[in-house]
Amino acid sequence: MKIAVGVRLAAVGAVIWAGMASVPAMAAGKVCDVKTYGAKGDGTTKDTIAVQKAIDECTAGKGGGTVEVPAGTYVIAPIVLKSNMTLHLAKDATLLGSPDMTDYSKVVFARHPTVQPLVGSVNAENITINGEGTIDGNGHIWWDYVRGVRNSGVLGTDHPRPMGVVFDHSKHIRMEGVTVQNSGFWQIVPYYADDLVFRNLRVLAPLSPNTDAIDPFSSSNIVIDHVFASTGDDNVAIKSGEINSPGPDDPSKNITITDCTFERGHGISIGSEIAGGVQNVHVERVSFKGTDNGIRIKSARDRGNDVSNISYKDITMENVKIAIYITEFYASKDPEGEVPAEPVTRLTPKFHDITMENVTATGSGVAASIVGLPESPVLGLTLKNVHLEGKTGMSIAYAKVTMDNVTVKADTGEAIKVAPTATVTRK
């Protein structure tokens, strides 16, 4: 199949990105069963060497091949995927992260010191991870450690935690059917990657710190489809760059998120670290159930850039704390009243050309909060057929908003509060 990215074409509620290279099905090649290479799969023996040997030998030739992981629990330290391979996880097969923290070598990732991810690729292409099995980061070891450090009050003793699956400067990637859960930190991370499909996945780690489900970072041409996620942080977080980034930073762009269900977590976020910008994101037919946020676009003066051509369609939210949250004051309290403008810099967030259509939210804490900067207000925000119910209503400041068939019901206070710094046009 081909999934196209590049030119946005609207067609009966669908968005197609034209020009994206097809994600290849792996050609017939070697089949390397990890047990043939000595893996035990008994839940106790460390099988890292055997699994990595299967990967290395299966990809040694030009044709590549399939690494088979049969039913069993395989304890592994970090493994590295290679070009032209399929990692097939059979039903009841689990790759389980080693509980030994010393198994995770220190590395620099995204300009920061950290440790190796459990499963990763670097400068690779044509990789598929599929099947009905599980990649389990065994994250409770890391979460308990971090909670203990944070509760100790001792500064400077935090320990970097391993991510689950990272595609670093890699392309033509497909993940389908598997479960990724309990990573020490972020769970699935395309980093400066291109042409990726994540379909029919379950990503799980509720009530755990910083366990974002899927975090595209300065990556392009991505499909996230039929994903169920329940995590301890963002269900999806689209990023590019970092706080006070020295640059240069590539944008994240050409991303579609369709037919997904998100439960615990912080919803779909763009930001907050977006020094490279984010463009061409389309979200359609997504359900949020009990998340902290639903639709969230967030940044601040020290980490922003251009965020544009963002659309949401056919979105339902139930019992979400904040249904729609757009802020250019992230990590600070949103201002009350007018605040002084500051000079526009390379890192000033610039949110514009954002559309939300056919959006409903019931049982929310806050229906919506939309706050731009005085020097860079939110521009071109269009709400069409949007119906929100919350304990409190919608507030708008430093923004220009067009509303077409919008209703807001608030248990207390004004349903829609428009600050003098904002302009609302009703059709």
PLM-predicted stretches and their roles:
Residues P24-K427:
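Extracellular/periplasmic carbohydrate-active domains that bind, remodel
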